[in-house]
Each structure stands twice: as C-alpha cells, then as structure tokens.
Amino acid sequence: MKTIVLKLGGEIVHSPELDLVARDLRTLVDGWNRVAIVHGGGPQATALQKRLGLETRMVAGRRYTDEATLEVMKYVVAGQLNVDLCARLLANGVMPVGLHGASGHAVQATRRPPRVMQGAGPEPVDLGLVGDVVGFNLPLLGDLFERRYVPVLACLGCDDAGQALNINGDTVASQLAGALRADALVLVTSTPGVLRDVKDPSSRIPRITRAEFERLVADGTISGGMIPKLEESFEVLRGGARSVVILGKLSPGDLVAAVLEPGSAGTVLE
C-alpha cells in the first residue's frame, strides 16, 4: 500500500485528460493505495474576476487576496471546481470527498505576515488574506483513506478563528505530502516530465537526483521556469515525502505506472 498526493492545476479539471487521471486513480484505490488530491483554480478565478470587473493583482507571481478576491476563490475553487472535479471522479468509479480548510479544519492555516519576496523589491509585501499551512486534520484524512474514499482538497485554508485564507495549491500539496510521509507527490503538468530537449518528448529523463539536477542546470539542459519548479520539488523531499513525480500529456495507465513502477512514466525526483 502506498500513499500518494496528486496535485492538479485548475486547467485540468475541465479537460479530457481528467478522465484518464480518474480511471488510473480508480486502479490505485482498488489496489488499496491511499490517494489524496489537491487542486487549484487560478485560471478560472482570474476569468471570474474579469467578468465581475475586479482587478487581478499579482505580486511576484502570487495573487493578492482582498475580501472580494477571497469571495471569488470560495466560489470558484471550493465551489465550482471542487464539485466538478468530484463529479468527474465519481463518474469514473472513484469515491471522492470534497474538502477545504473549514471542512473539519482539514487545512489549518495562519495569515501570512508581510515578508520580503524575490522579484517584489526590498520592502516586505502584504498579500492580504493569504495563508501559510500550519497543519492538517490527519485523523480525518486517515478515516477517509481507511474507507477507500479519496479526499479532494481545495487550496483554501482556515485559521482557528474561522477566517478562510487563500493558499497556493502547490504549497498545500507539498506540505500535505510531507505531513503524510507520502510515497509520492505527483505533479500533473503540461509536459511529460523533465526533457533533455523541450521539443522532443522522447528525451524524457526518467530519474533525477539533486546532484544530477545541479549538473543539468550547469550545462543548460534544464533552464527557465523548470529550475524553480524542481528546486521546490527537492524541498518537498526534505520535508518528508519519499519522491516527487512530474507527469503530463498522459496516456492511459501513465499515472499507475508512475506510482507503481517509478521512472516508467514522467520524471522521478529522489
């Protein structure tokens, strides 16, 4: 039995690829593996803000969250996307349970204090109603796993006073993987893994260690936005997860293979 945390971006929830994910999830759950899903919803939140005439304010890649923005995140992430995702999973034979920070305090958070952020100048930045994860209701998740339910967590936390807080989905997934001592954190992305040549899917690198990552950065094989993504992933390993898998452009069975036969699909960081 393995414990897997699966991070899905908001863009995959309404894509045909989700059905591939769902069918593979059913195979994993039927094999008595414990699976939790964390999802975001950035693109949909931005689209709704635009329709409502609200400004989307980004600071160093993070969404500034005022009261109006938090309402949008509740509607979109904890509402529409969580329901739609659970419905698609249910249609594929998976038994999901939709959760957010206020659901049994599943995602416990505190409001993030102002801090200096790379790319945002020398002064501390206040991101508004944005949270830092301080814990999870692990007994609740454990009970769901025992009954073969799949927790589906929206990336909203809640503090002890009942204040909902917006949290980056990758952060929630990474910290959940550490808290569960997950065998794998699987990041579903737009690429089939880390590639030696970004134009050639067959150049996938099956496994990368920290030392190999540093060498590939030095020789220019890994560059651009993939560098911070992999750096963050290696931090997940330090936080308690056993491996991180970067996976995308899925074919049937890829998710099962990536979890049960590490290196056979996507790229495994270890």
UniProtKB/Swiss-Prot annotation:
Subcellular location field: Cytoplasm
Feature type site, description Transition state stabilizer: K7, K229
Residues that hold substrate according to the record: G41, G42, R63, N166
Task: Kindly state which keywords UniProt assigns to this record, in alphabetical order.
Answer: Amino-acid biosynthesis, Arginine biosynthesis, ATP-binding, Cytoplasm, Kinase, Nucleotide-binding, Transferase
- One GO CC annotation, please? cytoplasm
Which molecular function GO terms apply here? acetylglutamate kinase activity; ATP binding
Would you say which domain of life the source belongs to? Bacteria
Q: In which pathway does it act?
A: Amino-acid biosynthesis; L-arginine biosynthesis; N(2)-acetyl-L-ornithine from L-glutamate: step 2/4
Give the reactions, separated by semicolons, that this protein catalyses: N-acetyl-L-glutamate + ATP = N-acetyl-L-glutamyl 5-phosphate + ADP
Q: What CDD domains does the record point to?
A: AAK_NAGK-like
GO biological process terms held by the UniProt record: arginine biosynthetic process via ornithine; L-arginine biosynthetic process
Give the principal location in a single coarse category: cytoplasm
Q: What is its EC number?
A: 2.7.2.8
HAMAP family xref list: ArgB
What family does this chain come from, according to its entry? Belongs to the acetylglutamate kinase family. ArgB subfamily.
**Protein name stated in the entry:** Acetylglutamate kinase
What organism does the UniProt record list as the source? Anaeromyxobacter dehalogenans (strain 2CP-C)
Q: Gene name?
A: argB
